[in-house]
């Protein structure tokens, strides 16, 4: 289980590479998970993607096997961006194709606006620009205060609300059990801290500043980001492309992996 220290944080990561062993010039794809998840959640993408690319998966700070910054840590977009840049620097990677899901996409937009020279392309999947009132309702399961609900339920209890609200996929009982167990591993103070950070975040002003080739994987029925919001993202990023994915909820990369992977791979092959 490889780890590397960047920006004063020990980060766990995985590299999957099933390309032909004699190839010397290999592009790297970075798959970044969302809140409460870990690098494990991309398991079903690896067979299709790692045959042609080196695939990098990183546990975000406080998630999976990466270090927990503790309950007094002040979460900020800037520090998470510094984590990302430090991670690339520590691995000696100059440029990657970046795909971020949900908050991973939010961070991807901000990273691309700040350090475009580090990305060959940007793909954002099911990513809002900001947490709207309707999204807050879905995240809390009603009109309840999210912080109190998280403190009361913990990650494992919260995930049940998210499945009911179609924020998280619940494909079958075995999948629900696995997802619940994985979410339970994320400390409650991490979930609360990130949600406080996102409550006031809005990356809309950064969209026109993104100058790297961009694909928007847009869910048609996400309770966290409407299709009209996804269109705004596509229209605000210069020359961005969009693929609308008809799924039951927010997690299209889980519910419709074949369609998402197909659109993603087609996008990469179109790049110069």
Which residues make up each language-model segment?
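Flexible "cap/lid" loop of the alpha/beta hydrolase fold
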Residues: 109, 113-114, 119-152
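Conserved alpha/beta-hydrolase catalytic His-Asp/Glu region
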Residues: 133-139, 151-208
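Gly/Ala-rich beta-loop-alpha elbow adjacent to hydrolase catalytic centers
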Residues: 100, 104, 108
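Conserved HGGG/HGGXW glycine-rich cap/lid loop of the alpha/beta-hydrolase fold
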Residues: 9-73
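Conserved acidic catalytic loop of the alpha/beta-hydrolase fold
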Residues: 78-96
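Short beta-strand/loop motif that positions the catalytic acidic residue
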Residues: 210, 216-218
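Catalytic active-site module of serine/aspartate enzymes centered on a nucleophile-bearing elbow/loop
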Residues: 240-272
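Acidic catalytic loop of the alpha/beta-hydrolase fold
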Residues: 221-225
């Amino acid at each position: 289980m490889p780890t590397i220290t960047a920006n004063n944080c020990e980060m766990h990561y995985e590299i999957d590479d099933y390309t032909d062993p004699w190839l010397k010039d290999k592009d790297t794809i970075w798959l970044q998970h969302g809140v409460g998840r870990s690098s494990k959640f991309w398991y079903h993408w690896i067979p299709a993607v790692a045959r042609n690319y080196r695939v990098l998966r990183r546990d975000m700070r406080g998630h999976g096997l990466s270090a927990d910054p503790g309950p007094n840590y002040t979460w900020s977009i800037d520090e998470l961006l510094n984590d990302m840049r430090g991670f690339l620097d520590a691995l000696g990677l100059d440029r990657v194709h970046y795909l971020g899901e949900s908050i991973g996409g939010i961070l991807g937009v901000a990273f691309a606006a700040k350090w475009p020279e580090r990305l060959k392309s940007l793909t954002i999947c099911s990513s809002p620009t900001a947490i709207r009132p309707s999204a807050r309702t879905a995240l809390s399961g009603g009109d309840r205060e999210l912080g109190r609900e998280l403190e009361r339920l913990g990650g494992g209890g919260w995930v049940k609300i998210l499945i009911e609200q179609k924020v998280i996929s619940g494909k079958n009982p075995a999948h629900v059990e696995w997802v619940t167990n994985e979410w339970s591993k994320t400390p409650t103070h991490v979930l609360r801290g990130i949600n406080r950070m996102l409550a006031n975040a809005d990356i809309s002003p950064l969209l026109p500043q993104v100058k790297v080739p961009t694909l928007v994987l847009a869910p048609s029925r996400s309770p966290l980001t409407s299709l009209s919001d996804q269109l705004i993202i596509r229209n605000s990023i210069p020359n961005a492309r969009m693929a609308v994915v008809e799924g039951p909820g927010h997690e299209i990369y889980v519910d419709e992996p074949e369609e998402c992977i197909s659109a993603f791979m087609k996008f990469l092959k179109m790049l110069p």
